[in-house]
Amino acid sequence: MQDLKASLIKVFGERHLVEAFGELTLIVDSQDIIKTCLKLRDFFYFDTLIDLCGVDYLTYGQSDWNGNASASGFSRGRNHQGSKDRHEQRFVVVYHLLSVSKNKRIRVKSFVDEAEPIIKSVTDIWASADWYEREAFDLMGILFENHTDLRRILTDYGFKGHPLRKDFPMIGEVEMRYDEDLGRVVYEKVSIEPNINVPRVIRK
């Protein structure tokens, strides 16, 4: 991995590369995503996109987060975070790439504007990005410019909003399901109470 890290630093610069927990993460400006991904594919042989998702940092570092917890076992230390630990930018698109021939992996992160979360599609670089980008659009509301079929992929017909956003309302919405007794589709009000079963941990 150190050889890959050194090569990436030569091309992209050290300040854009983060190494943590045995993984490399490349931070990329959204305007440079196509140029960067082409370099990763053509010069570093990352020929496979294995995952793409959106992340919402809206409540990152607020209540219910632990800042000091064991990385293994059952120990959980509690140290509530303050505003200094919150992300300056809200939405990020995360790409996980694999080089089959070199047996290397890398994560690419690109933050997008909160008011207009738009980034260019990478479907022309990796065809596997197609449904991943549709999922990120559906659940997070991130728009992928030049995607040829950017439709919802998981939510129901007529669904309003993007359900994985941290500010998505938990009450007042409706869901659709098939009622076997009535023999038709029905709409019911949704009321979901936030329930944290697994401690949220900020690892640095």
Curated annotation (Swiss-Prot):
One of its GO terms (cellular component) is plasma membrane. Pfam families: Complex1_30kDa. Its EC number is 7.1.1.-. It is an enzyme of class 7 (translocase). Gene3D superfamilies: NADH:ubiquinone oxidoreductase, 30kDa subunit. Belongs to the complex I 30 kDa subunit family. This is NADH-quinone oxidoreductase subunit C. It comes from Ruthia magnifica subsp. Calyptogena magnifica. The gene is nuoC.
